[in-house]
Curated annotation (Swiss-Prot):
InterPro entries, per the entry: Ribosomal_uL5 (IPR002132), Ribosomal_uL5_bac-type (IPR020930), Ribosomal_uL5_C (IPR031309), Ribosomal_uL5_CS (IPR020929), Ribosomal_uL5_dom_sf (IPR022803), Ribosomal_uL5_N (IPR031310)
Keyword Mitochondrion: no
Name this polypeptide is given: Large ribosomal subunit protein uL5
Statement: the UniProt record of this protein carries the keyword Ribosomal protein: yes
GO MF assignments: rRNA binding; structural constituent of ribosome; tRNA binding
Coiled-coil regions listed: none
Any Gene Ontology CC annotation: ribonucleoprotein complex
Provenance organism: Synechococcus sp. (strain WH7803)
UniProt KW keywords: Ribonucleoprotein, Ribosomal protein, RNA-binding, rRNA-binding, tRNA-binding
Signal peptide: none
BP GO terms, sorted: translation
Length: 179
């Protein structure tokens, strides 16, 4: 059963009851997932940008947008319009497919994994997770990468509070660390 189907058939009714909501439309749901990668020092290197774009495209299955510097910062040696990272926004079917792969395949492959931090909510029910290495995703082959790079994954939900967001992600199978 796909994550979207499981959400509709089991998670939504359970959250409706657990959070004591009166309407199905009040139940929190995932709106979008944003995968972002800043290049840092590698911003000077065009090859690393290309590798980053290709890796994110493989992981997400969607075209990647190159993010550019809004203004020049001499201390970081960047000029306005220079590529400084890349990002992908996933919605709909691709979003659910990515979340399913993240929760069931990628996260368990992290070394010494004890669960993700339950404190990384932003106060409005959205969750952000930092991944240190891209090789946890099965789409990336270890032999073909030139450097280990991380990424930020933000899960945007309609939850009003962190507790609602946590309940939603826990039901979806997100392995939260027990403190």
């Amino acid at each position: 059963m796909s994550l979207k189907q499981r959400y509709r058939e089991t998670i939504q009714p359970k959250l409706l009851k657990d959070l004591s909501l009166s309407n199905v439309h009040e139940v929190p749901k995932v709106v979008k997932v944003t995968v972002n990668r800043g290049l840092g020092e590698a911003a000077q290197n065009a090859k690393s940008l290309e590798a980053s774009v290709n890796e994110l495209a493989q992981i997400t299955g969607q075209k990647v947008v190159v993010t550019r510097a809004k203004k020049a910062i001499a201390g970081f040696k960047i000029r306005q319009g220079m590529p400084i990272g890349c990002a992908v926004t996933l919605r709909g079917e691709r979003m659910y497919a990515f979340l399913e792969r993240l929760i069931n395949l990628a996260l368990p492959r992290i070394r010494d994994f004890r669960g993700v931090s339950p404190k990384s909510f932003d106060g409005r029910g959205n969750y952000t997770l930092g991944v240190r290495e891209q090789i946890i995703f099965p789409e990336i082959s270890f032999d073909k990468i030139d450097a280990i790079r991380g990424m930020d994954i933000t899960i945007v939900t309609t939850a009003r509070t962190d507790e609602e967001g946590r309940a939603l992600l826990r039901e979806m199978g997100m392995p939260f660390r027990s403190n």
